[in-house]
């Protein structure tokens, strides 16, 4: 007993000694703020500054003397990018960096299902953790202002409420893996043309009402640990060191406690970077002033020049303590988080998640019969068609490649052609139909006319003998398409696809058009193509998702997260002169102001070809008459709107019920209506469910520039229950007191 007592006493003393020797910053049982304070007190000025800039293409330094590790970052709103060389953009050619390519974020937004966002964030977080990444550069929540923006496919559509609701679960689930979301591009990076210097000018109202809400939700609701600054200027000052957007709004108003990281090469001035809210400077070509073959990370704006300014007293020491504290907080949450899971990559669970997200995001734009009183063309009945011709470069193209920083190295990729052949077998033949060039960034192949003519002629000849033609076309992720670094050059389909569609229709009316893109396109043939599917960029399981929808194994339930204008000038950004879009290369003005997307179409009475929120099903839904819980809402009260929705078809389906609110009379211009709530409802054949939405005074407010505050004006309002922004199923009126 005595020996046991002595052993216990010795063990207790040993534990006490070890505990006493463990610095607070290394003790993960301590609060993060205590750890940050302790680590900061032990660091030299040089060590603090070293945290603030890159040490390689995708990493920033830790504090080796204190055992604080570096931060590793990776591109990847929809997949973890393959390993990049230490000091240039070349791929490192690892053999173990293949991953799951998830659907692009336009597809995720088109699910209108926050559960899919959570599933997405969880899976991509597990892959990033397995790849030992601390910061994932995504999600992107810039608003879809124009269909010409080459990077729209990385974002979540035109509506700030939809983007807000869909980004939050992604961020929360991602960060449960000890991987920081880096929400981008803050703010107003709404075009790629001249993105590095274009000076965006706009009203405070449109900034707060349209372009900031998703970022605000990411910070205040999602708890995002980092934010990426944009390349562009905002009212004369670069977004990566913009005092108004970073210090006042992000850090003061929203109480953001994380890091602001530049887009690569987005810093331009040491003093502004020091005092205007930037925390970590990353760069495309070291500091932008030397060739990337030269190792000059110490010449970054937030490196030696910043250190010298601090020593000379030209910037306050408080700036470096704030930056270092934020970076340490990020490191403790990620690289030094001992509770983080191990992670996994390219698992069956992840493939299943990618497939399900694709299934829920694919949008059935049109599904008409070929002959009057006939059945709609979709789904494709295997017993009805013996010869199915699949046409199109996108049917076989690896759409995980290209696009700039979104390029992915998928472990397994199922093409649309492979997916359809898995269902329909040897009934499926293939013709390329058009050429689209090699996957490249920054340039595009020229396609000889004889190649264009030959491929089209082959497809048309084969279409004559087919029972059904499925054209898988759209855009791709090459330069001047859906790609970083440049905007589209035309609103119409590229590579002669309009002519191909006309030629195919001339020999076979049974045409299903599948558009793979992250943008709207012009459709001069829309009235004559019986079935049109918006298929997005679907990732690893894209072919399976597409086959699930076309075959009817899954009933489509996606709805558009942005409007499809009939012509480009029907889009608000393009309804004015070039100063509105693309600008004069120096500056631009958002002349449509708050009337972005469906807000423009509604208010200006310019019908969209396919409206925001539109999406068909293989079943049908009816809506009952909506009922409000009261005739008026008190200033401190709420009001509910309830509507019954019934599946009147013969198969199960999901309907997205949308609630918009409009102000009957206001002292400032307001859109006809704005999205405030939505619900995705699963219904069996014949089943009916009631959907209830709760409105609060916040749902009725606009940003008042005179008082720099959100307010509503008492009066009459309408709540619109809709199947899309243009398909109003019921209206209830109420008063706001």
Where does each model-flagged region fall?
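Glycoside hydrolase catalytic-domain context in secreted enzymes
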Residues: 17-702, 709-726
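Bacterial Sec-dependent N-terminal signal peptides
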Residues: 1-23
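Short beta-strand elements
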Residues: 727-737
């Amino acid at each position: 007993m005595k020996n046991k007592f002595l052993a216990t006493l010795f063990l207790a003393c040993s534990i006490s000694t070890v505990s006493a020797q463990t610095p607070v910053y290394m003790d993960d049982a301590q609060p993060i703020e205590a750890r940050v304070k302790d680590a900061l007190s032990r660091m030299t000025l040089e060590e603090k500054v070293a945290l603030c800039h890159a040490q390689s293409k995708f990493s920033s330094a830790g504090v080796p003397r204190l055992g604080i590790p570096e931060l590793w970052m990776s591109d990847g709103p929809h997949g973890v990018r393959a390993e990049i060389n230490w000091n240039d953009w070349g791929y490192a050619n690892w053999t173990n960096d293949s991953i799951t390519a998830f659907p692009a974020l336009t597809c995720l937004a088109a699910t209108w299902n926050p559960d899919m966002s959570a599933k997405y964030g969880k899976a991509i977080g597990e892959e990033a953790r397995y790849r030992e990444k601390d910061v994932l550069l995504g999600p992107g929540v810039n608003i879809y202002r124009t269909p010409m923006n080459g990077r729209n496919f990385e974002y979540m559509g035109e509506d700030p409420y939809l983007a807000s609701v869909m980004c939050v679960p992604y961020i929360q689930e991602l960060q449960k893996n000890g991987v920081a979301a880096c929400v981008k591009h803050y703010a107003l990076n709404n075009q790629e043309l001249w993105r590095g210097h274009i000076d965006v000018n706009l009203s405070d109202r449109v900034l707060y009402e349209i372009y900031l809400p998703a970022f605000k939700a990411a910070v205040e609701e999602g708890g995002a640990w980092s934010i990426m600054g944009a390349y562009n200027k905002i009212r004369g000052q670069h977004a990566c060191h913009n005092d108004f957007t970073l210090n006042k709004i992000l850090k003061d108003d929203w109480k953001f406690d994380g890091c602001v990281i530049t887009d690569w090469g987005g810093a331009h001035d040491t003093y502004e970077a020091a005092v205007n809210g930037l925390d970590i400077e990353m760069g495309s070509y070291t500091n932008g002033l030397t060739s990337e073959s030269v190792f000059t990370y110490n010449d970054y704006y937030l490196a030696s020049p910043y250190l010298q300014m601090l020593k000379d007293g030209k910037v306050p020491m408080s700036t470096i303590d704030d930056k270092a504290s934020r970076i340490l907080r990020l490191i403790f949450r990620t690289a030094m988080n001992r509770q983080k899971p191990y992670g996994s990559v390219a698992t069956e669970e992840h493939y299943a998640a990618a497939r399900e997200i694709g299934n829920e995001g694919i949008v059935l734009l049109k599904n008409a019969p070929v002959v009057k009183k006939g059945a709609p063309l979709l789904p494709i009945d295997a017993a009805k068609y013996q010869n199915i011709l699949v046409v199109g470069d996108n049917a076989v193209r690896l759409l995980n490649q290209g696009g700039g920083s979104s390029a992915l190295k998928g472990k397994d990729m199922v093409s649309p052609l492979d997916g359809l052949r898995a269902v329909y077998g040897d009934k499926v033949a293939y013709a390329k139909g058009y050429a689209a060039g090699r996957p490249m960034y920054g340039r595009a192949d020229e396609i000889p006319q004889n190649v264009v003519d030959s491929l089209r002629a082959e497809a048309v000849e084969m279409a004559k003998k087919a029972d059904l033609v499925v054209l898988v076309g759209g855009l791709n992720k090459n330069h001047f398409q859906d790609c970083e670094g440049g905007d589209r050059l035309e609103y119409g389909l590229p590579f002669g696809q309009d002519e191909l569609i006309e030629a195919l229709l001339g020999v076979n009316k049974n045409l299903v058009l599948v558009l793979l893109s992250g943008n709207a396109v012009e459709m001069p043939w829309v009235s004559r193509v019986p079935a049109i599917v918006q298929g997005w960029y679907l990732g690893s399981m894209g072919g399976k998702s597409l086959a699930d929808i076309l075959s009817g194994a899954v009933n489509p339930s996606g709805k558009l997260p942005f409007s499809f204008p009939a012509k480009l000038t029907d889009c608000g950004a393009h309804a004015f002169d070039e100063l509105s879009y693309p600008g004069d290369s120096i500056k631009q003005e958002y002349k449509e102001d708050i009337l972005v997307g469906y807000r423009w179409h509604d208010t200006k009475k310019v019908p969209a070809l396919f409206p925001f929120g539109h999406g068909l099903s293989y079943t049908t839904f009816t809506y009952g008459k909506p009922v409000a819980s009261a005739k008026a809402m008190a200033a401190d009260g709420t009001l509910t709107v309830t509507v019954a929705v019934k599946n009147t078809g013969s198969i199960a389906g999901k309907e997205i019920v949308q609630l918009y609110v409009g102000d009957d009379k206001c002292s400032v211009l307001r859109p006809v209506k704005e999205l405030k709530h939505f619900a995705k409802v699963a219904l069996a054949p014949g089943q009916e469910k009631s959907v209830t939405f709760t409105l609060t005074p916040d749902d009725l407010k606009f940003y008042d520039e005179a008082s720099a505050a959100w307010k509503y004006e008492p009066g009459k309002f309408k709540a619109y229950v809709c199947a899309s922004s243009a398909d109003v199923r019921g209206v209830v009126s109420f008063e706001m007191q």
